[in-house]
Amino acid sequence: TATTRRRGRPPGFSPFR
């Protein structure tokens, strides 16, 4: 999921994907 794109970048997740 690319939901982190607007939330920022949590630990273990990429801001690009």
UniProtKB/Swiss-Prot annotation:
Superkingdom of origin organism: Eukaryota
Alphabetically ordered keywords of this record: Bradykinin receptor impairing toxin, G-protein coupled receptor impairing toxin, Glycoprotein, Hypotensive agent, Secreted, Toxin, Vasoactive, Vasodilator
Tissue expression from the record: Expressed by the venom gland.
Gene Ontology BP terms: regulation of blood pressure; vasodilation
Molecular functions per Gene Ontology: toxin activity
One Gene Ontology term, aspect cellular component: extracellular region
Localization in the cell: Secreted
Glycosylation sites: T3, T4
Keyword Oxidoreductase attributed: no
Family designation: Belongs to the bradykinin-related peptide family.
Function: Induces smooth muscle contraction. May target bradykinin receptors (BDKRB). May cause hypotension.
Protein name: Vespulakinin-1
Organism name: Vespula maculifrons (Eastern yellow jacket)
